[in-house]
Amino acid sequence: MSDFASSTPAFTLAGRRILLGVSGSIAAYKAAPLTRLLVQAGAEVQVLLTEAASAFVTPLTLGTLSKKPVLTGFLRDAAAGEWHNHVELGLWADALLIAPASANTIGQLANGLCPNLLCAVYLSARCPVFLAPAMDLDMYAHPAVTQNLARLRSFGNHVFASPSGELASGLYGPGRMLEPEAIVAELALRLVRNEE
């Protein structure tokens, strides 16, 4: 067990059902350690991967770490007419964590758009929702993104802070996805607070 896992109040995630939504951002590679940390903390993790995210990280990687098949679309078996029920997924979860949350996904969520399974689950979820934005600093500072994040907060969603640091573009500033260890720690703390 990692030092982080042994120092984290794992009991707060033990038995928790976490939907981890991964959207298209270079930070999608951080979904792998994030998934591992959530599982180590005792959570049952179901990963939802957007088509854009699959260009950065594979379903095989996240499925291996979560010990569950990764869901990438509405259809499970098109020939048989089997589909992934977004309503059931939204009701199953104790928390919906979207990390990374790209500018595109943030805009879709803020405006009630449903182009993919992740967005449909978001609109169906009755559980607390947590978003970890990840994009370049000018995108993060753009008024459209700022307004969309404010709107998501007004819906009761928690938006993690985006720390300053070196970005994939080589620029330095805010827009980075919060590190997986910090996300798991804050998620656990907020879920406990929600129950009190």
Please name every model-derived segment.
Residues M1-F130, L137-E196:
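A cross-family phosphate/adenosyl-ligand binding-site feature
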